[in-house]
Amino acid sequence: MKNQALKILTLCVLVGSAMSLKLYAQKGLNHSEIEAKMIKALEWQEAHPIFALAPTDWTEGAYYIGVSRAHKTTQDMMYMAALKNQAYWNNWQTYSRLHHADDVAISYSYIYIGMNDKRPGFVNLEPTKKFLDAHLHEDDEWKAGTDKSASGKTILWWWCDALFMAPPVLNLYAKHTNQPKYRDEMHKYYMETYNQLYDKEERLFARDMRFVWKGTEKDLKEPNDKKIFWSRGNGWVLGGLALLLDDMPNDYKHRTFYENLFKDMASRILELQPKDGLWRTSLLSPETYDHGEVSGSGFYTFALAWGVNNGLLDRNKYEPAVKKAWKALADCQHEDGRVGWVQNIGASPEPASADSWQNFGTGAFLMAGSEVLKLEE
């Protein structure tokens, strides 16, 4: 009798295990494979350094934000080693244009290191503080609107990419140093950009004032006569919102604004996801360049997965889209680890190819993986 009961118990365990494995396989995610792909991407990118202006520029800033997020999720010291190595060789410096949001993006990684390495004197955030103070409080021609008003460069963050580059840094710095004034200043300038570039009907951001319709014949349009909304540009914004919310206090007085904006944009991005999982470079005219693009799609995947993992987005509605997107992103990675199908540096929709890559594309890939890994937890 005991033997029969033992056999029945063993059979139940085996059947249960088999069903669990089957369900896990149906979900289409394998943690070990995701982690391996992320490490391969890191190793390839570290062996093939690239930047637009300098090792402290925005392209490296975006890449090392991805490395930071990968470390935060996995705690794999390969990521931290890469972070510390670049910070050491950069001497903890930002790039040089104090009025330009792009040039402080690299500081996200410095602050992240400081939050995880408490050795006295190891991390130097003084260059970051000097940049942020000058960026927020010193006069410049963009704030004054002089000489650039014809181009719409009349506010500090006049292009939507800026909402990824500077606000998460200011927010993280406020958290790390316990100085909420930096978050309050961030909100002030964020609202300027929101009011100037956010299209409430489309629930998307124009990249800059060139693409904001004014009701004239000069309005820029896609071949299908629709507005031009750039995938990576909106990826910068939505990915940046997830970064902001992740480190923003739950009782922050303006948090509801950011949560609502995040959910509004997320719902629109979900509506625009193509069947193969990857968003096209032109969101409202996907046929213009009818192939997936990794940088925008990577930021969307990160943001949507973060929203699911943190209870802001409905799991049943968004998780299938996230998994489909991750599978498509993974298929864009070459055998050696290089992540292809990344649109080159630009400011509007352009094509990509299997062989086009950029460090910020790798960063987007790592960010996506860092949140997709959490879906099964």
From Swiss-Prot:
Pfam families assigned: Glyco_hydro_88
Main localization of the protein described in the UniProt heading: periplasm
Keyword annotations of the record: Hydrolase, Periplasm, Signal
GO biological process, one term: carbohydrate metabolic process
Subcellular location: Periplasm
Keyword Signal in record: yes
Protein name, as recorded: Unsaturated 3S-rhamnoglycuronyl hydrolase
Signal peptide: 1-25
Catalytic residues, chain numbering: 161 (proton donor)
Enzyme Commission designation: 3.2.1.-
InterPro entries reported in the protein's UniProt record: 6-hairpin_glycosidase_sf, 6hp_glycosidase-like_sf, Glyco_hydro_88, PolySaccharide_Degr_Enz
GO cellular component, one term: periplasmic space
Molecular function as annotated in GO: hydrolase activity
Family: Belongs to the glycosyl hydrolase 105 family.
Expression triggers: By ulvan and rhamnose.
Protein purpose: Unsaturated beta-glucuronyl hydrolase involved in ulvan degradation. Ulvan is the main polysaccharide component of the Ulvales (green seaweed) cell wall. It is composed of disaccharide building blocks comprising 3-sulfated rhamnose (Rha3S) linked to D-glucuronic acid (GlcA), L-iduronic acid (IduA), or D-xylose (Xyl).
